[in-house]
Amino acid sequence: LKKSLQIGGAYVGIIVGAGFASGQEIIQYFTSYGNKGILGALLATLWFAFVGMCIAQISSRLQTTSHKDLIYQISGNTIGFLMDFVLSLFLFGVSVIMFAGAGATFEQMFGLPVWLGSICMIALTMMTVMMNVKSIINIIAIATPYLLAVVTIIAVYSIATMDLSFAEQATIAEQQLQTSSKSWWVTALLYMSFNIGVCFSLLTVMCGAIRNERIAGMGGIIGGLLLGALILLIHFSLLAKMNVIVGVDIPMLALANEIHPIVGLLMSFSLLGMIYNTAVGMFYSFTVRFFKPTKPSFKVAVIFMGGLGFLASLVGFTTLVSKLYAVMGYVGFILVGSIIFAWLRGIRRVV
């Protein structure tokens, strides 16, 4: 059970980046649908748990060491090559966004120059990535219960002090916020498929190191359920205070500061922790795609890619990645379909 909880915690830790923890993603994909957002959250939870279990079990069975091992097995050479290319570019791109985001967060919190904040995050990420995969799982998993505790405090406070009823708040949410689709269930599935693309690479590496399929699969289920719990907690926190947070850039931080500056500080560190988690997960997955962690060239590659990531964070590389986000949603659907089909077939290692 301990191993399954670690996998589940790391699964959550990879997906819960700054956009999730700040509340922006939850507003866009769930809360803007009012009460139907609850149904969307429940639908996404079921799919996160099921697909997470499928990835974990197949990866454990094939003993994968990078996403390449699994993608070509489940998708064939042509589609596999395209998905491998998009995923690899996406992993590096999200890493760069996290480095740039850390710089902006450090500037806002401590008044440090943006470049210095980025370098601090890159250095911390590189040191972590040079550890073995089991240590990385443990580090990423640690932040999950901390975030869960902070979000629970905010949710209890928001509901206890709400000015309007949930029905009135839902009306405000539906009227004033733009939605990415008119259908709550399509948006929920889009959110799931995109995030499976985000976590897929590290999840295959993590679970490839687990020999027991049942333990790995249980980790995927636990992670999916924890994600659902976080989505619902943040959704209710935001919906309860919709009349207060409309137009706010970081709504969860605004609610935390409303409780007490100390809670606001805890939330700020939580956001930094989520940026760090995502940066480590993406950067490690990208590097192991091309270099084996056991070889000396791996550490050299980590340092080189870290330097490249820093330069990319300064020269507007993030505009390219924003376009990749849209592509990743569609690639995510193909990926999810391939994973489920492979799981149903009971795919085995090709010797």
Say what each PLM segment does:
Residues Q6-V12, A41-L46, L82-F92, Q108-N132, ...:
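Transmembrane alpha-helical segments of multi-pass small-molecule transport proteins
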Residues K2, S32-I38, R61-F90, Q108-V114, ...:
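Transmembrane-helix boundary/entry motifs in multi-pass membrane transporters
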Residues K2-A21, G40, L87-L91, S95, ...:
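Hydrophobic, membrane-embedded alpha-helices of multi-pass small-molecule transporters
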Residues K2, Y29-A56, M218-L232, L324-F333:
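Extracellular loop-to-transmembrane helix junctions
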Residues E174-T179, L238-P261:
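Membrane-interface interhelical connector segments
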